[in-house]
Amino acid sequence: MNIRPIEDADLLEVQRVAQVTWLHAYKEIYPEKAILTFLSQAYSLDRLRDLLRTDSNKLRRLFYVVATEDGIVGYGELVERGFAEYELTRIYLLPEFQGKGMGKRLLNQLINDVYPLRQMFAWVEKENGGGRSFYESMQFHVEEEIEDNFFGTVTHLLKYVREWE
């Protein structure tokens, strides 16, 4: 397993991983049409190329992939939101690679590659039990709950926060 910054050659595989993981994680929460609409926007090749260019400066965004002999099996993105404050905007692994410590290794790599780090947060769908368990196992706690609208579906998001001194 190799955790590294995303490269242009990874974009199609990241799209594939996004489609599989989003349908797996959210199929019981959101309508499939909403998920597919989101994926077509957030994971279009143009959007991913924009993220790749932004990532190249390594100052405000880290976008890493988890690569194995099977190809790209996961990815994570960390975005600076303020001094020493970062939002984990996405972290996903293919279902067959979950529960093997890869997500923890990916998150720890992202954490290790930013300095200074005072606070990290992530918005998690309240109904996403697997996601919630992951963040809780990584010492995040719920700080806030908001109501959101995901392509016509009313949903509740939890803000998970972890702080460092």
Regions of interest found by a model, annotated:
Residues 5-9, 16-96, 107-113, 148, ...:
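Acetyl-CoA-dependent GNAT
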Residues 122-132, 149-154:
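Conserved beta-strand-loop-alpha-helix junction that forms the acyl-donor binding cleft
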